[in-house]
Every structure is written in C-alpha cells, then in structure tokens.
Amino acid sequence: MAITMRTLVAFVFTIFFIISFVHSRTTTSGYGMLFDSVACEGGFEYCPRGGGNDKCTTFCRSLPNKYDFGVCDKIYACCCHINV
C-alpha cells in the first residue's frame, strides 16, 4: 500500500510539473510580451520634473516609427512604446 501511495503522489507531482511547464511556455513570437518595440530617447525637454507623459507621448507620435505612447522614466528620458 505504501509503494502504491508513493507512486501515486510521484505521478500527481509529475503531471502538475508537466502542465505548469507547458502552460507557461511561449509558442509564438511576441506572445505574452507587453511591448514589441521600445525606444528611449534622452531629452529633458520631453520629460519635465514631476512627469510629463503627455509631452512625451506627443513627441513619440511625431517620430517616423509612429509609436503609440511615451513614458517618462526616472532619469527624465522619454521611452516610446509600440503596442503589440
């Protein structure tokens, strides 16, 4: 009985491991990623102190790559993003 119970527990853990591995695996490029393309442009003029995401977004939309929006990071650089 103990060998059967031990085998059953090992089998159940093996099944859980296989399911979690397959479930978290990426099968296509870009799947599961928040952004496909990111470009950070340094420039204090686009990200004033205390934010400035609106000015950054305006700048990013004017670029040739037509980014969707911009976000100011902690060093006041404007990072432009394209949604997936």
Swiss-Prot record:
GO cellular component, one term: extracellular region
Keyword annotations of the record: Antimicrobial, Disulfide bond, Fungicide, Plant defense, Secreted, Signal
GO biological process: defense response to fungus; killing of cells of another organism
SS bonds (residue pairs): C40-C80, C47-C72, C56-C78, C60-C79
Signal peptide stretch: 1-24
Annotated localization: Secreted
Family: Belongs to the DEFL family.
Protein name according to UniProt: Defensin-like protein 199
Lineage: Eukaryota, Viridiplantae, Streptophyta, Embryophyta, Tracheophyta
